[in-house]
Amino acid sequence: MDIVKNEFISDLLGIYGKLLTDYQLEIMELYYFEDLSLSEIAIDKDVSRNAIFTLIKRVEKILLDYENKMKLNEKIKKVENKIKDEKLKEDILNILLEGE
């Protein structure tokens, strides 16, 4: 798996994950965060490997569509690049991502 793509999709999951169904989010977390293979997820969920592959590709497209429309990841990266104080940066990102 491409490391840059993996990091990008992981970022998008952190931002837009709550907009996915519970099942979509669970599969994406297993694949991207738990590093399970398509086959391992398919066995665990009692579905075909192709069903998992198709779902992951569909959700990746959904996440990219969200980012193309809302540009939240792009804006977050701009904020990260402008702020030098690491504690302040962390506090701002927590507020942006968690709404606190």
Q: Where does each model-flagged region fall?
A:
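Hydrophobic positions on the alpha-helical face of helix-turn-helix-like DNA-binding modules
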Residues: 41-42, 52
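Helix-turn-helix DNA-binding motif, specifically the short coil turn and the N-cap/start of the second
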Residues: 48-49
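Short, Lys/Arg-enriched N-terminal segment that forms or immediately precedes the first helix
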Residues: 4-17
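Intrinsically disordered, low-complexity basic tails/linkers immediately adjacent to helix-turn-helix/homeobox/MYB/SANT
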Residues: 70-93
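Helix-turn-helix DNA-binding elements, focusing on the entry/boundary residues of the two helices
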Residues: 27, 37-39, 45
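Residues within the DNA-recognition helix of helix-turn-helix
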Residues: 55-58
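Short amphipathic alpha helix immediately N-terminal
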Residues: 22-34
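C-terminal flanking helix
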Residues: 60-67
